[in-house]
Amino acid sequence: MLKNISSVSKRFENFKNKEVYDIELYKKTVEEINNINYKNASDTELREISENLKNKVKEGIPLDEVLIQAFTLVKEVAGRVVGMTPYDVQKMAAIALHQGKVVEMQTGEGKTLSAVMPAYLNALSGKGVHILTFNDYLAERDFRWMGPIYKFLGLSCGFVKENMNLEERRKAYLKDITYVTARESGFDYLRDFLCTEVKDLVHRPFNYAILDEADSILIDEARIPLVIAGNVSEEGFNYDHLIEIVRSLKPNVDYEIDQHHHNVVLTEKGLIKIEKVSGCGNLYASENLQLLTRLNCVLHAEILLKKEIDYIVRKGKIEIIDEFTGRVADKRHWPDSLHEAVEAKEGLVSETKGRIMGSIALQYFLKLYPKLAGMTGTAISVMNELDRMYQLKVVLIPTNKPCIRKDYPDKIFTCKEIKEKTLILEIKNINATGQPILIGTSSVEESERIATTLNTEGIKCNVLNAKNDWEEAKIIAEAGKYGAVTVSTNMAGRGIDIKLGGEKELDRKKVVTKGGLYVIGTSRHESSRIDNQLRGRAGRQGDPGESKFFISLEDDLIKKYEIDKMIPQEYYTQKQSESLDNTMINRKINSGQRIVEGYNSDIRKQLWEYSYVIEEQRRIIHQKRHEILVDREPLSLLSNKCPVLYDRYLDLVGKDVLYKVEKQITLFHINKCWAEYLEYVSYIREGIHLVVIGKENPLHRFQSITIEAFNDMLDNIEKDIIETFIKANVTKDGVDIEKEKLKGPSSTWTYLISDSPNQFSRLPFIVKGVLFSLRSISNGIVRKVQETINVVIQK
C-alpha cells in the first residue's frame, strides 16, 4: 500500500503555491511504528507503558519523541478494544494531524480512528484535546465508539451536546479528550464571557483541536458568527404594514433584482410609491434610516428568500436551510431585522428579540486553539485559502485500497423538463436491477418533487432533507441496501458511511455484483467540493460504485451566475430528448463553476476585512475581562479616581469586600458596554454602504468609525464604573446586585447568524436609490442629475 505514496507526491506538483511534503518521511515513521510489536504484552503491561509515557511528557520530553511509541500503543489497544487496527494510511494521517495540518482522506478511509492517535498523544500533556465533530450525533457516537480506547490507556474521555447543563459541560471539558461540535465549544466560550465567578467557568485554557469536516467549517462556515443574546424588554416592530406595501410592488417596474439574485433594489417608481403610501417623506433622509433598513429586510424576505429552498417552517418557527448541506442549520438566525421580516412574512410570532451580549465568528474562535488540525474528504481545492486564512497546510492521504468507482461524464440537457424525465428513467432502469441508488438534489423542493414522481412510477424511496434531518443516521445507514433508493439534499458533512448491503452488510455480496452504490447528482453546486463529496459516497474502501451528474442549461447555478452566456446560443433552441455529448459545453460549465468558487472566495476575503478590526477588539475585551475575573488584573480605577470615597469604604467594609464590589461593578459594565457597542457596530455596518455617496472607501470608513467608537466605549466603561460606585450603597455584605441594577440578563440563548456577504455587493444599487431621493430637493435638479448619472453609467 505504501508504494502508492509516490503518486501522491506527483499530484501535488499540479498545484500552484504548493508546499512539498516529504511523504517518504511519513512512510519511514509508519515503518518504525510497524516494527514495534506489543501483541505479546498483557493488558496490564500496556497500561504501564501508557503511564510511563504520561510521566515522560510531564517531565518535559517533547511529544515528537514519544510519537512512535504512543501510536504503536494505540494501534495495539484499538485492535483489542474495538476490533479495529489502523491501516498505514491512517497512521500517516495521524502523523500529519499531530503536526497541525489538514489531511484529505476519502470517504470511508477511517478518519474517526485516525484522530485517536494524535488525540491520545497530545492528551498526555494533561492540557486537554477537543475533537470537533460536525454535529451532536457524531460527537456522542464517536465518544462511545472510541472512548474505550482512551479509558484502557488511562485517559478520560467525554462529550458535549446541546441541552447539557453547565455542570455536565464543565466535567466533559475537564476530561483528557472531549468530543464536541465547534459550535457548542464556541457557545460555551461566549457563556464564559458572561460569568462573574471563576467557579462558573466551563472551559479551561484551549490546547489542541482536531476538526472533522474541516473545509466545511473553516471555509464554508468560517464567517458565521456565534452569538449569545440576553433578554430585553422592548417590544418588537410590527412588519405587517411594510409587508403589505412590498406585496403591492411590481417586478421590473417598482424594483429590480441583480443578476445573481442576491439583491433587490427599488426603482424610482417604487420609491415614489412607497414614500406616498407610507407618508414618510424622503425615504433616504437620515431620520428614516431605520425604516429604510426594515424595508430592505422586507424586500429581501418577500422577494429573494424562498420557502422550501432557503428555509422551512416547522413547529411555528423559521428554520434556515444550509446552502451547502441542504439540511436545517441548527440554531441559525439571519440578522435580527431580516429574521423578523421572514417571521412576519409567514405570519409567525417573532421570537428573536434580544440584545447580543457577545459574538465571535467560527473562523476566529478556532484560531483560539494554539494547535489546530483538520480532516476532510475535500481539502486540496481550497488549500491556498486554508493557508492564507489559517496558515494550515494540506496533506493528501492515499486510499488504503485503489478507488474503482466509475465516474461517468455529465449528462447535459438544454431544459429541466427533459433532464428530469431522463433522470427518472435512469433511476427506474437501475432500480430494476436491485442496485442501490443515492440521488443528491439541490433543495427540499426538488427532493420532494423527485420523490413524488418516483412514488407515482411505483418506486419506493426514502427522503432525507431539511424537514426530517433528525432521521439522517437511520436513512443513510440503509442507503446501501439491495434495491434501496434514497433521495437527499446535499450530502456534504453527513459524516456517516454508506455500507453496501445496509448497516449490517447482510446483502453485501449481492450489491457488489450489481456494481455497488450508484450516486446521481441532479445538478452542479456552487462548490466543486460539494459535488466531489457526493461522488465520494460511492466506492468507499475499494468497493465498486458509480456516479453521474445530470445537468440542465436551465439549472439555477447556470442561470444565476450567467454561465449560460458562456455557451453558444444555438444549443438553447434544441429541445432534445438525448443529452448533449459535447465536451466544449462541459468545459464551459466546469470553468463557470471555478469562476463562482473564485467569486465566493473573494466575498469571504471581503467579509474578513470588515470583521478583522472588530475581532481584534473582541480579543482585547475578552482577555481584559478574563484577567479581572481570575484576579490577575489589579483594580485601581476607583482608588485613583475616587480616593476619598474609596478610603471611606475601605475603613467601613474592609479590603476584601471592597475589592469584590469593584470587581462586580467592573465586570457588569464591561459586558453592558460591549453589548451596546456590538449593537452600534451592527447599525453602522448596515448603513456603511451609503458612504460611497461621499466618495469614501466603505471599508476604511467602517474601520475608522469602529476604532473611534471602541475608544469611546473604553472611556464609557470607566465613567459607568465610577458613576455606579458613587451611587451604590456599599455595606459589609457588599452591594445589592438587584437594587443597584448590576444583574445581567435573566436568561440567555445562543444561535448563529447567517452573515450574508451580499450586503457589500449592493453598492451600485444603493447609490442609485439614494440618487433617486434627491428629487426631494428639486424635481428639475434631479432630472439633470439623473441625466448626468445615466451618461456616466452608459460610458
Curated annotation (Swiss-Prot):
It is a peripheral membrane protein. ATP binds at residues 90, 108-112, 497. The keyword Secreted does not apply. The keyword NAD does not apply. One of its GO terms (biological process) is intracellular protein transmembrane transport. GO terms for cellular component: cell envelope Sec protein transport complex; cytosol; plasma membrane. Its main location: membrane. It is an enzyme of class 7 (translocase). Its EC number is 7.4.2.8. It catalyses: ATP + H2O + cellular proteinSide 1 = ADP + phosphate + cellular proteinSide 2. One of its GO terms (molecular function) is protein-exporting ATPase activity. It comes from the Bacteria. Keywords: ATP-binding, Cell membrane, Cytoplasm, Membrane, Nucleotide-binding, Protein transport, Translocase, Translocation, Transport. It is found in: Cell membrane; Cytoplasm. Pfam families: P-loop_SecA, SecA_DEAD, SecA_PP_bind, SecA_SW. NCBIfam families: SecA2_Mycobac. Part of the Sec protein translocase complex. Interacts with the SecYEG preprotein conducting channel. Has a central role in coupling the hydrolysis of ATP to the transfer of proteins into and across the cell membrane, serving as an ATP-driven molecular motor driving the stepwise translocation of polypeptide chains across the membrane. Monomer and homodimer. Part of the essential Sec protein translocation apparatus which comprises SecA, SecYEG and auxiliary proteins SecDF. Other proteins may also be involved. Belongs to the SecA family. This is Protein translocase subunit SecA 2. It comes from Alkaliphilus metalliredigens (strain QYMF).
